[in-house]
């Protein structure tokens, strides 16, 4: 499985992005639980899930910064 591209995350709406972040955090929690109980079959999924979470949170932060810049520019 190839790592997902950040362009895919940028295409999501704000609501979809928030849902995807929550789902990815839940998946990471489940993977940690599986690892603790020694049921983890694919340890590389940690890398993929953390990578995806980083991408999603980066896109979320980019949008926050863009909104802040718009607000600051509209005040001037």
Curated annotation (Swiss-Prot):
MF GO annotations: structural constituent of ribosome
Keyword Ribonucleoprotein: yes
Keyword flag Ribonucleoprotein: yes
Assigned GO CC terms: cytosolic large ribosomal subunit
UniProt keyword list: Ribonucleoprotein, Ribosomal protein
Membrane-crossing residue ranges in chain numbering: none
Pfam families: Ribosomal_L29 (PF00831)
Gene Ontology process terms (BP): translation
Coiled coil segments of this chain: none
Origin superkingdom: Bacteria
Protein family per UniProt: Belongs to the universal ribosomal protein uL29 family.
PANTHER family named in the record: 60S RIBOSOMAL PROTEIN L35/50S RIBOSOMAL PROTEIN L29, LARGE RIBOSOMAL SUBUNIT PROTEIN UL29C
Protein name per UniProt: Large ribosomal subunit protein uL29
Lineage summary: Bacteria, Bacillati, Cyanobacteriota, Cyanophyceae, Oscillatoriophycideae
């Amino acid at each position: 499985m190839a790592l997902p591209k950040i362009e895919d995350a940028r295409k999501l709406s704000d609501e979809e992005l928030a849902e995807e972040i929550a789902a990815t955090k839940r998946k990471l929690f489940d993977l940690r639980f599986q690892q603790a109980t020694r049921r983890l079959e694919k340890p590389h999924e940690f890398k993929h899930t953390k990578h995806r979470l980083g991408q999603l949170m980066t896109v979320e932060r980019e949008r926050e910064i863009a909104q802040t810049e718009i607000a600051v520019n509209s005040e001037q």
